[in-house]
Amino acid sequence: MKRKTLTQYLVEQQRSAQALAPEVRLLIEVVARACKAISHAVGKGALGGVLGSLESENVQGEVQKKLDVLSNEILLEANEWGGHLAAMASEEMETIHRIPNRYPKGEYLLLFDPLDGSSNIDVNVSIGTIFSVLRAPHHVSGAEVSEADFLQPGRDQVAAGYAVYGPQTMLVLTIGQGVVGFTLDREMGSWVLTHEKISIPADTKEFAINMSNMRHWDAPVKRYIDECLAGKTGPLGKDYNMRWIASMVADVHRILTRGGIFMYPWDAREPGKAGKLRLMYEANPMSFIVEQAGGASINGTQRILDIQPEQLHQRVSVILGSKNEVERVGRYHSESLT
């Protein structure tokens, strides 16, 4: 049986009760093409002269990798001329990128982390691109877009997805109608539907967290991890395995494939920050995907998708994955407040 391509899937979704606006379909296809270009650059590695770091830092205060900058440029250049967007925002840029006046403007906003997990670039571990699509507020149609127009809760996302650059390059996508996965056919140059109706089991025996930071976590997270480590003889009554790749895309992709819970909690070393991960570029799109796959995502006490953003580069604590495990951690946080 012939497999569907990304274009075929999106056209079918567009025709199906108008579940997908034509502009969003075209926008997703452009993002997917940009991800192919990034995949090619990642795949060349040292042969393409793209490994290593630059002397510059991004707005987060992180030293930029060469591929961070290249991936950001690829996404900007691919998306600014198509007429689907009013503006873009990137984890790598301090301010928003408005569509130049020489190009037509559309009704949507695109946010992205051009290369998540870039600390793994030089050691050849899976990395990825995360993106989120929002509708621009009606009042900005034909007007100047501002940063405030991006500050919408995650539940308002129109689409979200990520590309993972590993042994195979995959694109995982939701438009609010479940989660599907496409594999890049490198010979044909097309995205092919290989994973339909992706779902996360409600229970798990795997957790993903950086255990070296355990002494810095708050009590509810420590309690849950202690119970996982206690195994069959502990209160959870089962043995757990720990996994940690230090690439959110890779860790979440594994959870979508076989279940698990991913945790990047608040850290006492930076008590003034709500967390490490970025709400708009990482937590919101990944939470949308995880919820559409039957999982859950919280910051400890609140559903991630209900958080009202206050800043473009806002950070947040993230606990997502198998629903029953996430809800357990949420209960522990609630109990700690009483």
From Swiss-Prot:
Mg(2+) 2 binds at residues 113, 116, 282. The keyword Glycoprotein does not apply. Its EC number is 3.1.3.11. GO terms for biological process: fructose 1,6-bisphosphate metabolic process; fructose 6-phosphate metabolic process; fructose metabolic process; gluconeogenesis; sucrose biosynthetic process. CDD domains: FBPase (cd00354). It is found in: Cytoplasm. Mg(2+) 1 binds at residues 91, 113, 115. It comes from the Bacteria. Signal peptide: none annotated. It catalyses: beta-D-fructose 1,6-bisphosphate + H2O = beta-D-fructose 6-phosphate + phosphate. Binds 2 magnesium ions per subunit. One of its GO terms (cellular component) is cytosol. It is an enzyme of class 3 (hydrolase). Its cofactor is Mg(2+). Pathway: Carbohydrate biosynthesis; gluconeogenesis. One of its GO terms (molecular function) is fructose 1,6-bisphosphate 1-phosphatase activity. InterPro entries: FBPase_C_dom, FBPase_class-1, FBPase_N, FBPtase. Homotetramer. NCBIfam families: PRK09293.1-1, PRK09293.1-3, PRK09293.1-4. Belongs to the FBPase class 1 family. PANTHER family: FRUCTOSE-1,6-BISPHOSPHATASE-RELATED, SEDOHEPTULOSE-1,7-BISPHOSPHATASE, CHLOROPLASTIC. This is Fructose-1,6-bisphosphatase class 1. The gene is fbp.
